[in-house]
Amino acid sequence: MTEQIIAQRLGIALRQVQGTVRLLRDGATIPFISRYRKEATGSLDELQVGAVKEQLDKLTELEARKQTVLSTIGEQGKLTDELRKRIEACWEAVELEDIYLPYKPKRRTRATVARERGLEPLANSIMAQNSHDIARQAQRFVTADVPTPEEAIAGACDIIAERVSEDERARNSVRRTAAREGAVHSRLVKGKEQEGVKYSDYFDATSPLRTVSSHRFLAMRRGMDEGVLKISVEMDADRITEGLRRQFVRHGSATREWMEAAVADSFKRLIRPSIETELLAAAKEKADDEAIRVFAENLRQLLLSAPLGQKRIIAVDPGFRTGCKVVALDSQGNLLHNTTVYPHPPQNRYAEAAETLRSLAARYKAEAFAIGDGTAGRETEQLVRGLGLEGVGVFMVSEDGASVYSASAAAREEFPDHDVTVRGAVSIGRRLMDPLSELVKIDPKSIGVGQYQHSVDQSKLRARLVTVVESCVNKVGVNINTASKHILTYISGLGLALAENIVAYRAANGDFKDRKSLLKVPRLGAKAYEQAAGFLRVVGGRNPLDNSAVHPESYHIVERMAADAGVTVEQLLADKELRKGIKPERYVDAEVGLPTVTDILEALDKRGLDPREQLQAFSFDPDVHSVADLREGMTLPGIVTNITAFGAFVDIGIKQDGLVHISQLADRYVASPADVVHLGQHVEVRVTGIDTVRNRIALSMRKNG
């Protein structure tokens, strides 16, 4: 049944879901399934396999909750066959909790107290709605704890109110109406005007619950968490209460007065707060999911940023008072030299710094400069460009997360004898060479490409970001003989322990000559090898296929292709025209389908190639260094640094990034900023607004005003 529910929810064929679930339960990873098991999944891509896994996890969790509910009700002796069937047939968490509510262990409530005082029979009489002498009946319930008939009736109404609040139909009716027509409203907490000025847009704001945007709701939530705002759900209480009256108060009821009072109290005191909490939690989850989706997509783009490649680099972590930390790196990213120069105020040793940088570039045959884009970054870039070093590229590199890495255990382990400034400069240089290999060492949340990342569900955020890192690492593949344990950790089927074992084995035994040698690594068994091998590359090894995305389990197919063509595997790999003549369907059999054969041929064409784009040179406007240099209407080059649901932030070479609102991204309607821009994209923007008080810069990419 689980697979059928998933297929229905995702709109994917049952056979595809069944194949995917079987592989997931067998311990296969998402990258492995989507890349090497297309016959089993009907060629589902990574996102679809991930969606199946997410639904499977949710339904597994729901199944566990159902067992808890069944057990609890069973212990109360109230589990009927009909109730068991209803619970077992339930596949929605909200519905399950509604069924469970009347049986759920409670704290002491007004209704609990009323029952303890023996008022349940009176409540039953009122709910029967056919007795005209309730006031006289109530006198029989007068005791020391219930001194008057009025108090007896009030207690009985408390019991009725709780029953109404636990009625599935009633809760569903209120939930549907409030979700469809309700609005989320934020208002200022009295006396917080100055403290909460940044939330001024939300001091008295209302948005339809169905359509409130992720960033707007999360901003409200953050304001609430900081004690500046209060949030509530506005709903038509009178109309909803009237609907409940129609459900519970019969026409011609003899106890109408008390029933209507109990229903109104039930809605105001019990149902509304409960449904309001539920709806706000659902809105929070929806907003979290959208914010996490945006963060994950930004992270994916950043991790797959174009690498400069294995080049000799001079990296600079700029600064004013503390100077610029300079490091020289070889083409493998190893630290060769470090020093500090002081070209900027207050020291102003410009000529000395220029000579030092020129000398280092010559001594270490530098092919590029990597300059951090933080404090003093533009000034340092100007200095380096002014050196006039022919054939040496100059690149600005994002510093986001570099300070986190430099103070981390990973950095201390690699550079125990150097301080955080040296480690930070090394990270900047390596990030230019290969962003992916360097960024995997940093907690993804510290990279700075999120939207309200500290306000969303942290466990869900971390799980999603880890999935993205795994996806990117396995998409690119890694060289088994140069990869750090940090990047190996994310390879399909490995994890930290096996990554450390691989690095230790490599250090003790030298480079791996082929993929099969991985099986000699301690604790790396057949299952881990199956999951990992296709994503690990052996460059210049014994078997040329080891430097491709072809899985070892499919080598025999390539060998057949070569044999059929009358050539060796090496000759087949070297001759693109020969490969063009291969007919994939000839190699399809009961074990291997057309998708796998097609992927094999594609992998042979791309053997040894990096799937990432080529790095492009870029420079900011040399006349713009601060907000004071900006004028409305001026056109500037920029780099997209962050993408949100409401637009894109662009670095224009000053301390503060500008915002291109979604409405200003193009001369047409834009549904999502990601449809128009990507991280690191070089764009041309026009300044449309400068707010020096709130430190905001408005930009536009529209050509027609």
Feature names for model-found ranges:
Residues 95, 395, 401, 406-476, ...:
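Long, charge-rich intrinsically disordered scaffolds of nucleic-acid metabolism proteins
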Residues 176-182, 316-320, 374-379, 397-404, ...:
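A glycine-rich phosphate-binding loop feature that marks nucleotide/adenosyl-phosphate handling sites
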Residues 11-12, 306-308, 470-504, 622-660, ...:
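C-terminal accessory/binding modules appended to enzymatic or scaffolding proteins
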Residues 141-149, 205, 244-267, 271, ...:
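Low-complexity, acidic/Ser/Thr- and charged residue-rich accessory regions of DNA metabolism proteins
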Residues 29-30, 45-147, 475-614, 621, ...:
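Accessory alpha-helical DNA-binding modules that contact the DNA backbone or grooves
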Residues 278-296, 411, 446-477, 586-632:
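Long, charged amphipathic helices and adjacent flexible linkers at domain junctions
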Residues 45-51, 58, 62-72, 76-315, ...:
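Duplex nucleic acid-engaging cores and interfaces of nucleic-acid transaction enzymes
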